[in-house]
């Protein structure tokens, strides 16, 4: 069997098949469905305790101990500007660090775990920082890019934050082979900062959902490659779905072809089951135009397997095979 690029061959709807079950949300969407932005967190400073003492008649009685915490004026938020992710492409994030107090902070470091999660005994990251992508703003004015260090996590260093100011980092991360792709999957990304001397760590998270859609490819083969006049020939059309959403009848995907030379007495099968003319396909022995009926073509979703050692995810596409056999 040989594969050829087909002339006069189209798959109507295949390259336009996008089934979005979780369309991107806007940066400013604060609805309950938008889980990409978490409530801002403030730094905890020192915890302090206090106890009163009562003395009378040579006796000493201690009160209960009270506990309270000092809060700094720092606030950290993280937002995924890109609403969904797929096997290829980038996710855009924004981290905002706001100083609402009267104390200036210098040389702060903001870290990003790039969505790290555990697979077996290994920790893998489904995202890779896009080199040179970070843009740094202080009070809305672009600044020189911060120092970027990539180790166990992504770190932006040397950030100074005067009293009453707001720092914003916008950067991109590329989806890699460890990103989960099955329907319903998410990447949970955590940012943190040291807050300067004497201040505890603050974290903020952003969650991005996988894009749920079909992703179709199509190929065609002919057998035999050399056929005599009035001989029989079989065309095999293979449709693969690399996406996490199946093609179902209501998606109305159509395969069409023009057989030249024209075939006669054709037999058509889909995944080994014979299709009836009129309900499964239409064909003209005058023009050679062949078309499947809308709804006859279905393709299962891909399946995904993750290596427990490396964390790399392999994709097994869903496949449907259409054959057309006739006489030349």
Residue ranges of predicted features:
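Cationic, amphipathic, low-complexity segments that mediate targeting or membrane/lipid association
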Residues: 10-16
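Exported/extracytosolic protein signature
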Residues: 22, 27-328
